[in-house]
Swiss-Prot record:
Belongs to the intercrine beta (chemokine CC) family. Keywords: Chemotaxis, Cytokine, Inflammatory response, Secreted. Gene3D superfamilies: 2.40.50.40. Its main location: secreted. Chemoattractant for blood monocytes, memory T-helper cells and eosinophils. Causes the release of histamine from basophils and activates eosinophils. May activate several chemokine receptors including CCR1, CCR3, CCR4 and CCR5. May also be an agonist of the G protein-coupled receptor GPR75. Together with GPR75, may play a role in neuron survival through activation of a downstream signaling pathway involving the PI3, Akt and MAP kinases. By activating GPR75 may also play a role in insulin secretion by islet cells. It holds the Pfam family IL8. This is C-C motif chemokine 5. It comes from Sus scrofa.
Length: 50
């Protein structure tokens, strides 16, 4: 289940030295996360289904 404060996400570009997922909150804050972590994949799946 995804926290309600997350609106969307995107992956960093291939130009970045480190792969990451960036979540956007309702207050337009950006939160970087490791795409290999289980909780990150779960949040992505939850956002895709909503």
């Amino acid at each position: 289940r995804c926290p309600x404060h997350l609106q969307e996400y995107f992956y960093t570009s291939s130009k970045c030295s480190m792969a990451a997922v960036v979540f956007i909150t309702r207050k337009n804050r950006q939160v970087c996360a490791n795409p290999e972590k289980k909780w990150v994949r779960e949040y992505i799946n939850s956002l895709e289904l909503s």
